[in-house]
Design a protein with these regions (language model features):
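Terminal leader/tail segments of proteins
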Residues: 1-138
Length: 138
């Protein structure tokens, strides 16, 4: 039988349960680095951070800070009740490929217009992602 243990957060620690719904967008100047197959495929200090109840923060990277030559359109799409329709990318570096590993909102709903064409990745599908020098565990 699994025991349920409630973890108390530290005063300076964020909790996904404190994040808002609908989601909030914040500018982030943290150094974001995304590495796939040993290659830095995205790096910025101009990300947008989206916070939503029960979800880890998502960092959206400006397209000009992404090596888009490593990204190709994927047939997958999803719909967020707040942000609208998301399109997906497959990432390929050398002989290594990850399908549906990144996404973006081509035409997000009005409150989220600042996210248009910014790219987010699934950290678990990359070699490593860093946020402010700290390895992402999401």
């Amino acid at each position: 039988m699994k025991s349920e243990k409630i973890v108390q957060k530290n005063p300076n620690q964020e909790s996904v349960w404190d994040y808002p719904r609908p989601p909030r967008i914040e500018d982030s100047h943290k150094h974001i680095q995304v590495i796939f197959n040993g290659v830095m495929i995205a790096e910025t200090q101009r990300a947008m951070r989206v916070l939503e109840t029960s979800h880890p923060p998502v960092y959206y990277i400006p397209p000009e800070d992404v090596r888009l030559e490593c990204f190709s359109a994927s047939p997958r799409s999803t719909f967020c009740e707040y942000k609208g329709s998301a399109a997906y990318y497959t990432i390929r570096v050398g002989e290594r490929t990850k399908t549906h590993a990144a996404w973006f909102y081509p035409r997000p709903a009005a409150p989220y217009a600042a996210l248009a064409n910014y790219v987010a990745v699934y950290p678990s599908r990359m070699d490593v992602c860093y946020v402010g020098g700290i390895r992402s565990s999401a």
